[in-house]
Amino acid sequence: MRDASTRADEPPLARATDASLDALHRGLGWVGRHALGCSIAGAGVLALIAWYAAWHVPSSGWLFLSHYAVGFKDLVYRVQNVRNVQVGRTLYYAQLGTLQYFVYPPAALWLFWPLTWVGRFTGELLWTYASLICLAWLIASAGRAACAWRWPKAWAVALLVGAPLSALVLQPVGVHLALGQVGLFLAAPAVFDLLCVRDRRLRGVLVGVTAAFKLYPIVYVAFFALRREWRAVWNALGSMAAVTALAWAVFPGYSETFFFHRLLNGGELRHYWRNDHWISSSSSLYTVFFRQPFTGSPPERAVGLVLCAAAVLLGVLAARRLLAERREVGALLCLALGATVGSPVAWDHYFIWVVLVPFVLVERRPLAWWRTAALWLFVLACLVPLRLARNESLSHRAYDGTFLVILTARNALAVTSLVWLVAACVPARAPDPDGDRDQPRAATVASHQARSAG
């Protein structure tokens, strides 16, 4: 712990954050001492949230009165995709006229296949509950890495505190649940692999498996590369290839269409250019150049793609900086947000990574004040129902106060993500080596122990 004089030298925001974190630490200590009971209670709370979502989305307000035209819209279409495959119908259409088409590799069909064995309500209830359990798994993995918690305490905190609060308060998580999205099923095992798996024979395998279901997680191989864990890189690529090959053997026609036509013909991106929902709601830097005052002209599109590549590179550089400071959770957040805003399509539910912020704040404290401020800005953007102010019909064309509100709502997630990435790149003051030698961080000690055990 730092002494009073050290705390007095800190900016007010940092002192307030430290005081809040200390109080939270005391509360979580009680949860850790009653881990089993808290885990059971937390699982029950998540079951109630899943039941509420299954019954009330979209007929009543879900998070700040954010109504949805159809509950679990994306999940309903994915289950229908599986039913089409079961009777030999088309999975990948040549003309992409709507957003509701299958965007994943054929291996992802297995994620949705069990939902065809039950009724719609049961499927939505089970899917939502499983999503919340995956959210708890993600949070528990981050807690173990950042706070050196034992698994019982990590799961207790995640089930009783982290996952319920995230679902009820954070907009990206709420949107994810209301649409029946798949992201948490992929993020949880990937985070566990990146932060907790230390056995060199297994490290990287789960990242590769998730990348076979959706190509996006392959970006996390950069995490292993930055740490020069080359065996983990090959494990990830090998497991991705193995799952893809298995899916190719089961779905040869669909696999050929996806990898040789859908990914190569450019239609996956071009069809968005005239889609009002994407233009108004995507938080990608590429999408910015299709909004007022831009028109999506060829030069503007080229600039957008360059900026997307720059955002991904910025995320990698920020992750490298934080890994050099031994802040693994912070580095993962940088990679995730860089890849998100650097993707040509970035929906609100892509920003579920906000659940990592508390652990970035406590990992190897103290965090530099400018980084703390950037993280709080990102959290603030994730608390506001931005989708309600984006003018999805694109009907407002005037340059007035309303335009500024719309502009802010459309770009808040991207801007605050970039602010964090820039803040993470700015070097922080090196810790006092004598202080570190006398009082080693618990997280560092646990990390060394875990590596030795692995």
Feature map (PLM): residue ranges:
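Primarily membrane-embedded glycan-assembly and transfer machineries that use lipid-linked glycans
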Residues: 2, 9-203, 227-348, 401, ...
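Aromatic-enriched
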Residues: 52-58, 361-450, 454
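Juxtamembrane/interfacial segments around transmembrane helices
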Residues: 90-101, 211-217, 265-268, 285-296, ...
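Short alpha-helical "patches" and their helix-cap loops
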Residues: 124-130, 208-209, 237-240, 261, ...
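Membrane-embedded alpha-helical segments of multi-pass membrane proteins
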Residues: 129-134, 181-189, 210-216, 237, ...
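Transmembrane alpha-helices and membrane-interface helical segments
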Residues: 137, 141, 188-199, 224-228, ...
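Transmembrane helices and adjacent periplasmic/lumenal helix-loop junctions
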Residues: 207-224, 342-353
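Short amphipathic alpha-helical segments
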Residues: 333, 337, 348, 352, ...
